[in-house]
A protein has these predicted regions:
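Aromatic- and Gly/Pro-rich donor/ligand-binding loops
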Residues: 3-14, 18-155
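A nucleotide-sugar donor-handling region in carbohydrate enzymes
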Residues: 87-101, 112, 137-209, 215-216
Length: 228
């Protein structure tokens, strides 16, 4: 059995990598005899905006040493990213079909975010209607009930063999877009235990108690909040 995962595997942030890793490892556990691969489809516009954002030198914030450290971190991140097996590079639905996959999994991450630069009908299954395709816990991100739904996502959503989302807004979107009821499913980052990876990389626990806040935007935290 050959399984392909269509997701934002090329996006350089921790959440994107962890959901891909969680999905890959979970599918390998469920189907140990299967060949599981990430479908190497890259939306070039999305990739460029992401990488430019990372490599941008911020005057007054970055210094030469912090910028060098940023590049080092990017190289380390890319090493882990590429540890997940992927297919040959594909650019169209036909090229994905030519991979002759037995199952295509769409998700998770914000692959259904109509408002972002990563939008493409392919991520909704459009062009893959005759393939065995399911959507596992994708998200619409910033999409709301007021967001217009492009007609070219309808066919893909309508023909998915199974359909789910990871949040309420995604379930609402599916019903509004194609009239189907989607199931709410757990994000794949919660399906896989990363402890073995942490141990293998010899990552030591911090010698103090802390709360980790992961956010893609810079949020001002007041001093009283910081102290508490």
């Amino acid at each position: 059995m050959r399984i392909g995962i269509l997701t934002h595997h090329y996006v350089k942030n921790y959440g994107a990598f962890l959901q891909m890793k969680g999905m890959y490892e979970t599918l390998q556990r469920l189907y140990p005899e299967a060949e599981v691969r990430v479908i190497n489809y890259v939306n070039q516009k999305h990739w460029r905006r992401n990488i430019i954002h990372i490599l941008h030198f911020r005057p007054g914030v970055d210094t030469l040493s912090t910028y060098v450290e940023k590049i080092r971190q990017l190289r380390t991140f890319t090493k882990y990213e590429r540890s997940i097996p992927r297919t040959r590079s594909v650019k169209t639905a036909k090229e994905i079909i030519d991979l002759k996959l037995d199952l295509i999994v769409l998700g998770s991450d914000e692959i259904w975010n109509l408002c972002g630069s990563g939008y493409h009908p392919l991520k909704f299954g459009t062009g893959l209607e005759n393939q065995r395709t399911i959507a596992y816990a994708p998200s619409v991100g910033a999409v709301t009930e007021e967001t217009a739904v492009p007609e070219d996502v309808f066919s893909g959503l309508k023909h998915l063999d199974r359909i789910s989302g990871r949040d309420v807004e995604s379930l609402k979107f599916v019903e509004r877009a194609c009239g189907r009821k989607a199931e709410k499913m757990l994000d794949p980052t919660f399906l896989y235990n990363f402890d073995m990876d942490i141990e293998r990389e010899n990552i030591k626990p911090k010698p103090y108690r802390y709360i980790l806040i992961y956010d893609l935007s810079l949020i001002h935290i007041s001093e009283p909040t910081r102290r508490s």
